[in-house]
Amino acid sequence: MNDRRDDYRDTVFLPVTSFPMRGELRRLEPRLLARWAERDLWAELRRKSRGRPLFILHDGPPYANGHLHIGTALNKILKDVVNRARQMAGFDALYIPGWDCHGLPIEWRIEEEYRAKGRDKDAVPVVAFRAECRAYAEKWMGVQGEEFRRLGVAGDWADRYATMDFPSEAAIAAEIGKFLLSGALYRGLRPVMWSPVEKTALAEAEIEYHDHTSETVFVRFAIDPARTGRADLSGVSVAIWTTTPWTIPGNRAIACGAGIDYALAHIDSVELGSLARPGEKLLVALALLPEFCAATGIATHHVEHVFKGEELAGLVCRHPLAGHGYEQSAPIFEGDFVTTEQGTGFVHIAPGHGEEDFALGQAHGLEVPDTVGPDGTFNAWVPLFAGLHVYKAAGPVMKALEDAGTLIARGRLVHSYPHSWRSKAPLIFRATPQWFIRMDGPENIRGKALAAIAETGFVPARGRTRLASMVEQRPDWCVSRQRAWGVPITVFVERRSGEPLRDPAVMARIVAAFAAEGADA
């Protein structure tokens, strides 16, 4: 047996470098970063890049509200790779980092500190609260900036920007002023996604969808013979289905589909425990009648007549809580959004709690009742439910309907439902006066955005279709928030008429004040 141990190192062609065998990054990375700083590598790159074509990476800034997490780090590292690659490809990759310092995430953190200390936010002057938000954001900008530098992200960290810097606040006010002067900024009453926990409207980007179990109800709306003039429909009720029983107090109408077939069903017998009544007559979409009977415990029935939806439009029903403080009627209107996918083929319309409800109500001059306050509780003037929170209202509303004899059935549905990305609480649609920017009209923001999307390269290419679809369908942009920490909408409004003041000189004075003293000026 040969014990000789051959050394083959000299026979293998390997590169020779000064790199150590071990990375020892914990020890060596700080040295490397210190050497970059000592050389002022960023300034050196800028000097060597003079005259090159610029490459600007438009970076959505992070929130200054805590240590970096893996998502923030990955986002910034990938962008750093892009910038470095373009720099080495012959461009001047000028990257100026920044932070989003306004808005709910930071305000929510300050409120959490208040709650932990038993402080009442409402007792704190707004300017003092804003100062605390500013100090909090300033602190975390410093922390995050050091963490980004520790990751090796190259950028002009000495000249960073922040949305709370006075020049930034002035620029935001100036842009809002342009929309005001052009007429694109307007104040309107409209249902928006509302967070009862944060007491504010939320943007689409602030909304998450999670599975949620909702209470559902089938409710009968009795046709009012005195208002209808249809003897053949005496004693007939329209059946509706909703996943938001708490919106019943805000009902002002019913929608039907013009081309949908509706069965006038005579109930012959019901199962034990059903709230349906033998002998009653209900109007339900013909295609949904079997599902309706199964869900409501109707054992047998027969169809007396089939109507088209257009024949039912114009009928008037009583509110299901009539006699209990709800004496308003519920007329039936055609709605192009009504389908036979689920429910009864009729849609209960609460103009203050849904986009389609609101639009139909506006088209027919319906009032928009103010039933729910900013904190999600029914207002004092709402019969039966004043002071009750909408999250807890399903049971009491169903009990009131049952006592009134208008509840047909109840159930539960697990479905995807909007939640606040910050509080994780369910949201509601709530009609409130808000400030909007028109997507259409003379400014043609939608058209300009779609044209820009068409001219932009997307990787992957399907991103263009997705973004264009979102822009095509989005309603006017709600820019107002009912919060303290942000750039205020700088509009003076005539107290009696509500008409905004559109004066370029006034707007210029506001912008100058913001530039000098910030939004607290």
What role is predicted for each listed range?
Residues 2-18, 22-25, 31, 35-39, ...:
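Residue patterns forming the tRNA-binding/recognition surfaces of aminoacyl-tRNA synthetases
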Residues 22-53, 294-297:
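Histidine-rich, glycine-flanked metal-binding segment
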Residues 47-110, 172, 240-248, 255, ...:
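N-terminal catalytic cores of NTP/NDP-binding nucleotidyl/phosphoryl-transfer enzymes
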Residues 53, 215, 328:
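Residue-level signal for beta-strand positions within conserved beta-sheet cores that form or flank
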Residues 89-90, 294-299, 365-366, 518-519:
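Structural alpha-beta junctions
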Residues 96-98, 263, 491-494:
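Hydrophobic, aliphatic-enriched repeat segments that assemble into extended interaction scaffolds
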Residues 253, 260-346, 355, 359:
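Protease-associated
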